[in-house]
Amino acid sequence: MKDITLVLLAAGDSTRFKAPFKKQWIRIGEIPLWQYVAKDLSQKCDFSDIIIVANEKEISYMKKIERNFKYAKGGKLRQNSLANALKKVKSEFVFVSDTARAEISKDLIGRLINECEKFDCVSPFLGVVDTTYLGRNQIDRNDLKLIQTPQISRANLLKKALESNEIFTDDSAAVAFAGGKLGFVEGDEKARKITFTSDLAHFDFTPASGTIFTGNGFDVHAFAKGEFITLGGVKIPCEYSLVGHSDADAAIHALMDAILGACGLGDIGELFPDTDDSFKGIDSKILLQKVVNFVHLLGFKIINADITIIAQKPKISPYKEKMCEILSEILQTSRVNVKASTTEKLGFVGRVEGVAAIASANLGYFDWRKF
């Protein structure tokens, strides 16, 4: 078997996909598309290594899902992403594909591999069947090729090509620039690319699992002298303030940890460390929106949230409805509940030294069939 590394590109922003989630994070049953594609390709070819190129913020989460792959940070352009992956490639050949090209046949893979010894880069192509013009001049359609992915190249030559400052549209253009020999094989009409949500109708994917994920969070902040405290996004007039790096909204902090916990994304200290001055005094609603946006991109929707605020003073009940209204808008669900409790004058809460909050959240996968 030839020495070939699979590089799967999954760092795109899915701008044209027009959904709350990135296409690489749609769930095929329980697994995200990038993992589904990588495993499907690995069953059709015995790759010496598999490297996933992804957004830097998503890599740590990907590693929790799939520990048998290697990961490389995505770049500004496709070729920057590929160059980052090539630093980890030790094989003679590299097989580069896109997560969006979700169903590659074993026959197409075989055609590419069978030709790779003869050329420096081999690409699949589709012929043009329609009459074609360039401006006002008709072109012989037999001279035209519509290039698809995946492509297989000699790794060292592709690395060399990408060291230049030229902009390349694909691997074949880069290898040609470096003086390499190009080969072409018959492509596959069925090797569709997912660009828009409507493209998903062409794939016979298993729908996203209906699994529910539950997380919980807890937070405490101490009182200082002041004029108001902020809880659940609502300013509550009182003789106190809350001490913290941000606005010390314990209710929202507990809620964020509950959401992150449900997804297995760590805690808010990892996302928004108190050593980062950009978060000094920040409105916690802004941080919550960032958390919601992030879990949405990863394919999760928030089903419901339940928060208990524990405070001897001030009275929380008059503000619960407004808290629910604010949080429902951010979470994009009406299923938000806020409760108030005391400790019957026991402990630091009973001594009016601070407040605590407990939160639970249930999340599920977006049903991509509805988009």
Swiss-Prot record:
CDD domains: CDP-ME_synthetase, MECDP_synthase. The record marks 16, 23, 245, 342 as: Transition state stabilizer. 4-CDP-2-C-methyl-D-erythritol 2-phosphate binds at residues 219-221, 245-246, 267-269, 272-276, 341-344, 348, 351. GO terms for biological process: isopentenyl diphosphate biosynthetic process, methylerythritol 4-phosphate pathway; terpenoid biosynthetic process. Residues 213-371 are annotated as: 2-C-methyl-D-erythritol 2,4-cyclodiphosphate synthase. PROSITE patterns: ISPF (PS01350). Its EC number is 2.7.7.60, 4.6.1.12. The keyword Cytoplasm does not apply. It comes from the Bacteria. Gene3D superfamilies: 2-C-methyl-D-erythritol 2,4-cyclodiphosphate synthase, Spore Coat Polysaccharide Biosynthesis Protein SpsA, Chain A. A divalent metal cation binds at residues 219, 221, 253. GO terms for molecular function: 2-C-methyl-D-erythritol 2,4-cyclodiphosphate synthase activity; 2-C-methyl-D-erythritol 4-phosphate cytidylyltransferase activity; metal ion binding. The record marks 141, 193 as: Positions MEP for the nucleophilic attack. Pathway: Isoprenoid biosynthesis; isopentenyl diphosphate biosynthesis via DXP pathway; isopentenyl diphosphate from 1-deoxy-D-xylulose 5-phosphate: step 2/6; Isoprenoid biosynthesis; isopentenyl diphosphate biosynthesis via DXP pathway; isopentenyl diphosphate from 1-deoxy-D-xylulose 5-phosphate: step 4/6. Keywords: Isoprene biosynthesis, Lyase, Metal-binding, Multifunctional enzyme, Nucleotidyltransferase, Transferase. Its cofactor is a divalent metal cation. The keyword Hydrolase does not apply. In the N-terminal section; belongs to the IspD/TarI cytidylyltransferase family. IspD subfamily. In the C-terminal section; belongs to the IspF family. PANTHER family: 2-C-METHYL-D-ERYTHRITOL 2,4-CYCLODIPHOSPHATE SYNTHASE, CHLOROPLASTIC. Bifunctional enzyme that catalyzes the formation of 4-diphosphocytidyl-2-C-methyl-D-erythritol from CTP and 2-C-methyl-D-erythritol 4-phosphate (MEP) (IspD), and catalyzes the conversion of 4-diphosphocytidyl-2-C-methyl-D-erythritol 2-phosphate (CDP-ME2P) to 2-C-methyl-D-erythritol 2,4-cyclodiphosphate (ME-CPP) with a corresponding release of cytidine 5-monophosphate (CMP) (IspF). This is Bifunctional enzyme IspD/IspF.
